[in-house]
Every structure is written in C-alpha cells, then in structure tokens.
Regions:
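C-terminal boundary of histidine-terminating zinc-finger modules
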Residues: 322-332
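Extreme N-terminal, non-catalytic leader segments
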Residues: 26-29, 36-37, 41-104, 342, ...
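N-proximal, solvent-exposed amphipathic alpha-helical segments enriched in charged/polar residues
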Residues: 1-34
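Phosphate-binding loop that captures ATP/GTP phosphates
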Residues: 123, 128-184, 195
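C-terminal accessory "lid"/substrate-recognition subdomains
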Residues: 288-314, 331-336, 340-366
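Switch II (G3) loop of P-loop NTPases
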Residues: 154-156, 177-192, 199-227
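Conserved catalytic-core segment of NTP-binding enzymes
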Residues: 59-60, 211-212, 218-318
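Walker A/P-loop phosphate-binding motif and the immediately C-terminal alpha-helix
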Residues: 100-136, 263, 270
C-alpha cells in the first residue's frame, strides 16, 4: 500500500475539533504536510494552547481516523504544537476585572443559576460592564437560559495569544462549557480535565474590562470551587438557598467553605429563593411552601445581609426556559425585584471594598 499526504489529510478531515466544531483541516490545525516514510506517518497538529482540554481526545481521534480510513498497519506519530503566547500567571489573571462575585449554593435545585443569570442581566441594566461564567462543567445551563444554545464562541488574536471571544447577549458577556459540548451528551471527565477546561474559560478568553464578573458555581463544595479559589481573587460570595431546612443545612456548609481560614472570601449576603408563593387571583396572600424566613434567620445567625427574598413566580421559570430571563423585562414586578437585588449587591460590594483588602488567592502549596 502506498501512502501519500492527501490520503492522510482526508482521514484527518473526518475528525471534528470540539473547540471550533469544524474538522482538523477546516480548523487549520494541520501545521504542515504530513511526513511519510513507508508505512510511518508523522502529523503535526497545531492547538490554540498547551492547556487545551480537548488535546488528548483530539490526538486519539486523529490516530484512530488514520487507522480506520487507511490501515491499522500505519505507524502514526502525532506531534502537538501551540500557537498562543503563555497565559498570565495565577494572581495576574483578569487584571481588567474589578469585582468577581461567586454565586453559590450548598444544594442543587435551589435556583442558583436562575439567580446568577438574572443578577448578571440586572447589573447590565444598571449600566455596569458584566461577564458571566458558567462554571458548572458537568451541568451547564447558561446557554439554554440565555437562548444562545446554537451560538459558538470564536477565537480572536490579541496580545500574541488566541483568545476565546465570549458570546454576548442582554449586555452580558457569557461563556460556558455548554458551547463546546453536545447538550444531549454527558461530560465524562475526571476532575483534573474539568478544572483545566474551567481555567481555559477564565484565562484564555477575551473578557475585557468588567465591573462585575459573575461566577455561576456548581452546587456543593468541589474541585471546581477550589480551582476558582486558586485562580481568581474573589471579591465575595452570594449564597442562594430555599427556606427549607435541608437546603439551609447545605448552605451553612457553603458559607463555611468561604469562611475557612485558608480561604477567607467575604460572604456578601444570602438570597432566599422560592421564599413564598402568591396566587395571581389572591395577590395579598403568601403561602410559605418550603418554610418561612429560613434564610432570614440564617443570615441573622451568620451576621450577613439578607439580599432578597424571591417568590415562586411562573414567569421566572418560563423566562429561563425560553431564553429570556425575568430581569430582561425591567417593567415587570419580577424584573424590578432583580434590579433591586442588583442594587443591593452593588451596595454590599462597595462597602466590602471600602472596608477590606482584596481577597488573596488560595495557595496551592500545603
């Protein structure tokens, strides 16, 4: 069997690079003409950066494609090269970002992502420059909530580096791993790979100047949270919970993580989501389905502000499902509620910055 470069390139054209959703040839990742010596083939693939989370899987796919489309007898050597300048050191990332706000919850299903999306949009409505990072690598929801599931971020060349350009909607710059993986496919990554992808979304993106960088974190306390704490100086954390005691118990754990002596991230306040239900036909009535004022009592116990009590409202749920969060409708009752929340966050952030030094990044050394 005689091998020739075009044959190799045709095989590589069947491999899709997840970073662009194009094949390796269309993505211009073939650095040079494949080198052939008998049944030995050398391919040089050019990746945007050495931290690319898709590097190993793409290399394996390229090798498998050559074996499948040409012959298993081909001895394949794949060399990787990188075209970006080194990313900034930890501690020097995102120097143009003024405030980094982590929106957290101890338990899933309390509406944390809904709060994150609406808070980011409300801050933008107030005139601030806002970025929103969906840090839930295994369960991203922001593309759906913003109605941008079909969008794909592209790369821009800036300061000697190829950077991901965030998707922008409702005045908010947005990135999520959901833009790079299929919405119907589970992300089966170990913690290290997930954290590497998260770092790429932070350090290898063109976030530009931001007044507020909102981090929609996954529930609980995990590798993702630790990576954020080791990568960014977090101005403060906002804790979201329902009034239910089982949710409040996990909210305490989230607060404890940020208040740990090695972390010391200020708690900006608590948000009580699903605080009560008011039927449209009985607007004066409040039904406390999940308990009454649980977050208010916890906030008092922890000596932190209660930033908002958000009721169960059908339009809030529908807005997230339809890609038009409630905060986009500034004239509605729910839109005004999220504007009020945003104003409260601005107030506590300004107070925190006036009274406390910037948060130190958690050391990676024991």
């Amino acid at each position: 069997m005689t091998l020739y470069p075009k044959l190799i390139e045709e095989a590589l054209a069947t491999v899709i690079y997840p970073g662009t959703k194009k094949n390796l040839i269309e993505s211009e990742m073939l650095a040079d003409t494949p080198s052939i010596n008998g049944m030995k083939v050398k391919v040089v693939l050019l990746f945007p950066r050495d931290t690319d989370p898709f590097l190993k899987s793409t290399v394996k796919a390229a090798e498998a494609a050559i074996h499948y489309h040409i012959s298993k007898d081909v001895e394949v050597e794949i060399v990787t090269e990188f075209k970006s300048a080194p990313r900034p050191e930890v501690g020097k990332m995102l120097p143009q970002v003024k405030n980094v706000i982590a929106v957290s919850s101890g338990k899933g299903g309390v509406g944390k992502s809904t709060v994150s999306a609406n808070l980011a949009i409300a801050l933008a409505k107030l005139g601030y420059k806002v970025g929103l990072l969906d840090t839930d690598i295994f369960g991203p929801s922001m593309p759906k909530m913003f109605g941008v599931e079909e969008e794909r971020p592209y790369y821009v060349h800036k300061d000697g580096r190829d950077l991901i350009e965030p998707v922008e909607k409702y005045g908010v710059k947005l990135l999520s791993i959901g833009f790079f993986v299929s919405p119907t496919t589970a992300t089966l990554w170990r913690g290290g790979m997930a954290c590497s992808a998260l770092k790429q979304l932070i350090a290898d993106a063109d976030w530009g100047e931001l007044d507020y960088f909102i981090l929609d974190t996954p529930p609980g306390t995990s590798d993702i949270h630790l990576t954020l704490l080791q990568t960014l100086s977090i101005t403060g954390a906002v804790i979201v919970s329902t009034p239910q005691q089982v949710a409040l118990a996990d909210a305490r754990k989230g607060i404890d993580m940020y208040q740990n002596d090695k972390v010391n991230v200020p708690i900006l306040g608590l948000i009580e989501n699903m605080a009560y239900f008011t039927p449209a036909e009985l607007p004066e009535n409040k039904y406390y389905i999940f308990g009454k004022e649980g977050c208010k009592n916890l906030a008092k116990e922890m000596n932190v502000p209660l930033l908002a009590q958000i009721p169960i409202v059908q339009s809030i749920c529908e807005g997230g499902d339809d890609g038009a969060p409630a905060a986009t409708k500034v004239d509605s009752i729910t839109g005004q509620a999220f504007l009020s929340l945003a104003q409260s966050v601005v107030t506590v952030v300004n107070r925190r910055n006036a009274e406390k030094a910037p948060t130190k990044i958690v050391s990676t050394h024991k």
